[in-house]
Regions:
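Short, structured segments at the rim of ligand-binding sites
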Residues: 1-446
Length: 446
């Protein structure tokens, strides 16, 4: 188990290129199984979860060509040799379950063990099952395997929750189903839009992605294409927070403006704001490749304020930040915002509605000197500013891990973060990225 050693009180400032969105890349990798032709994805992040997802794809016989330097991945599923995911791979990454929809659509069957991933709370799969059944698949649910089989037909499906992965799985299953499928109460996240754009580029007919009603006209077959993974606005929010708590000026490249409209209100509560502008630049076209001229043409600029101050509600009521399904504030940024609150003058209530175990990491922040009261598994009250002090902490999951990194960057002294591999699942080489921005951070093998 590796660790990160961070010596705090250094300004994080400069220019950082935001990676592609992990939550878009993973289902897009799974979608490549829907055709026998090559599918090329660009702007794919070089992170551990992507590597694991590609290993799962290879287990089906998919040929994978990856160029990490250009963030390009090409997948060719000419022949799918099995409909079963190896249990050892499924235990490592929860999104292995996203292969269920494509396999069911292409082969008419799928068998996989219960998925793994971060232990941030109970995440039900019932919505996936109900969607597959509605499309005509018959289920055989055992203790160690989840199996579905059948010929899929379009229908109307009302999801009992706006689950992102359920929406993705049912969407991928329905593109090769006969007839029309209507998915009500669909998730609206930007990565759903990225997936739909890929499917349409492959020859599918998907309308309404980004709204709570998605319609699909089933196709007989899909073909290969090239598609781009959208920007990781969660990574962007993490780096903005790191700059804010250390007093640095930051420019983020390779961003897209749409997701930040959802984030800006919550960040403004803490006195953090930014501007996004077009930065047209010349594209370098590699031989035989098509490059979108505007692919990286937006930049985000953050200029720090002298002091961070909480913006209270009318009547000086304590503000509350709650997560929810898009376009509510994303759960993946709540841990990061809690660290921002420790460095902001004022008090704020955080309400984690989606995962009952996500907020337990605040014990590590309290160990570092944060003034936090945990009301229950879903709510904490943070009062700032706090003078954080380094120590030894353990990263329990991706988002809590990066939150601890940010806390260490503004803490006095040295902080050792154990289980650094959990952070690698969602962030590209944080020691190099933050190091390039002025942080004193190094990785050590434990």
């Amino acid at each position: 188990m590796g660790s990160l050693i961070i010596r705090g009180k250094r300004v994080v400032a400069g220019t950082h290129r935001v990676s592609g969105n992990k939550n878009a890349a993973l289902p897009m990798i799974a979608a490549a199984l829907l055709t026998s032709e090559p599918v090329t994805l660009t702007n794919v992040p070089d992170i551990a979860d992507v590597a694991l997802m590609l290993e799962v794809a290879k287990s089906f016989g998919v040929k994978v060509s990856r160029d990490a330097k250009t963030d390009r991945v090409t997948l060719t599923a000419a022949k799918v040799r099995t409909a079963r995911i190896p249990s050892d791979l499924a235990a490592k990454i929860r999104t292995s379950f996203l292969f269920a929809g494509p396999l069911l659509a292409r082969l008419g069957r799928v068998s996989l063990p219960p998925p793994g991933g971060d232990q941030i709370g109970h995440r039900r799969l019932d919505t996936h099952f109900a969607g597959f059944r509605a499309l005509g698949a018959k289920a055989a649910l055992g203790r160690k395997t989840l199996a579905f089989r059948g010929t899929l037909k379009g229908t109307k499906i009302l999801l009992d929750e706006a689950s992102v992965t359920a929406t993705e799985n049912i969407l991928m299953a329905s593109v090769l189903a006969s007839g029309r499928t209507e998915i009500y109460n669909a998730a609206c996240e930007p990565h759903i839009v990225d997936l739909a754009n890929l499917l349409n580029a492959m020859g599918a007919t998907v309308d309404g992605a980004g709204t709570n009603l998605i319609t699909v006209e089933g196709a007989e077959e899909l073909h290969g294409c090239t598609a781009r993974v959208g920007c990781d606005y969660i990574e962007a929010g993490s780096y903005i927070t790191a700059a804010a708590v250390t007093g640095g000026e930051l420019t983020l490249t390779n961003v897209e403006p749409e997701p930040f409209a959802v984030l800006e209100g919550a960040f403004a509560r803490f006195g953090v704001s930014w501007t996004i502008e077009k930065a047209k630049r010349k594209s370098e076209k590699a031989k035989g490749e098509e490059v979108e001229d505007d692919a990286e043409a937006w930049e985000l600029h953050y200029v720090p304020k002298k002091k961070l101050k909480m913006k209270y509600d009318l009547g000086d009521a304590i503000p509350s930040i709650a997560d929810g399904t898009w376009p509510a504030f994303p759960s993946d940024l709540l841990s990061i915002l809690i660290v921002l609150a420790t460095q902001t003058r004022g008090t704020c209530l955080f309400f984690e509605k989606m995962f009952e175990s996500r907020l337990y990491f605040v014990d590590h922040l309290k160990q570092m000197g944060a003034k936090i009261v945990q009301c229950d598994p879903h709510r904490v009250v943070v009062t700032g500013p706090c003078a954080l002090v380094g120590g030894t902490v353990t990263s329990p999951d991706i988002r809590a891990g990066i939150a601890l990194v940010i806390a260490a960057l503004c803490a006095k002294g040295e902080t050792k973060i154990l289980n650094a591999e959990s952070i690698d699942r969602g962030y590209v080489s944080v020691e190099d990225s933050f190091g390039a921005l002025g942080a004193n951070i190094e990785r050590k093998a434990s």
